[in-house]
């Protein structure tokens, strides 16, 4: 989701906050933290599967933001995509260090969307546990693309930036993931 799609500050307001943050203005940095905290935490919680690690990685994400905000440039990607890229990289480092995913609890719903989408309807009809099992059968890259696209509503371009892939690769991963899920769901209904 781009900043203009959020029920929060506009892209221009985010830009001003980033510029003020780059000048070292503490209030602007705090505002950027408050605007992005819930989505970053939810993404990391969904990615690593437990609250403790998600909290640690969220803290590390915002620490990296503070350290690197001076290097951020508004060129091809919005600030939120840059911040999610930091979170994504930290989660990949976490996986390499721990070699496995350890879910321990339910993942919180990200804030923002109150309307039920087609994805929500499908999720309800299949059931939470069944859907989690289906998604778990996908590759890690496919899971990441679906999470960024359908949970966090990022565009293909933004997801590509976050995952350091081409837009075509993101479209391909999404397509293969959805085809795989569709085959699995169709197979389950036939039984």
List where the protein language model places each region:
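Short, charged helix-capping/linker segments at alpha-helix termini
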Residues: 3-6, 20-31, 41-60, 167, ...
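Internal acidic/polar
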Residues: 10-14, 101-128
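Short amphipathic alpha-helical boundary/capping segments
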Residues: 16-20, 130-138
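Short helix-capping/turn signature of helix-turn-helix
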Residues: 34-38, 46-49, 136, 147-155
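Short, Lys/Arg-enriched C-terminal cap helix and immediately downstream tail that follows
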Residues: 44, 96, 138, 143, ...
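Structural recognition of an alpha-helix C-terminal capping motif at a helix-to-coil junction
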Residues: 56-63, 77-89
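Arg/Lys-rich amphipathic alpha helix in sigma70-family domain 2
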Residues: 67-74, 85-105
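Helix-turn-helix DNA-binding module
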Residues: 133-144, 152-169
């Amino acid at each position: 989701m781009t900043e203009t799609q959020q029920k929060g500050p506009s892209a221009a307001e985010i830009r001003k906050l980033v510029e003020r943050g780059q000048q070292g203005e503490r209030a602007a940095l705090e505002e950027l933290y408050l605007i992005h905290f819930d989505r970053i935490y939810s993404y990391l919680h969904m990615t690593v599967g437990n609250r403790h690690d998600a909290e640690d990685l969220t803290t590390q994400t915002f620490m990296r933001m503070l350290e690197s905000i001076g290097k951020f440039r508004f060129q091809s990607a919005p600030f939120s995509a840059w911040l999610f890229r930091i979170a994504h990289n930290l989660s990949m480092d976490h996986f390499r260090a721990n070699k496995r995913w350890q879910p321990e609890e339910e993942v919180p719903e990200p804030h923002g969307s109150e309307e039920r989408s087609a994805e929500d309807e499908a999720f309800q009809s299949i059931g939470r546990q069944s859907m989690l099992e289906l998604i778990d059968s996908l590759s890690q890259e496919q899971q990441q693309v679906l999470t960024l696209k359908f949970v966090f509503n990022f565009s293909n371009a933004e997801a590509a930036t976050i995952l350091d892939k081409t837009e075509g690769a993101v479209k391909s991963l999404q397509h293969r993931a959805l085809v795989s899920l569709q085959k699995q769901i169709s197979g389950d209904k036939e039984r």
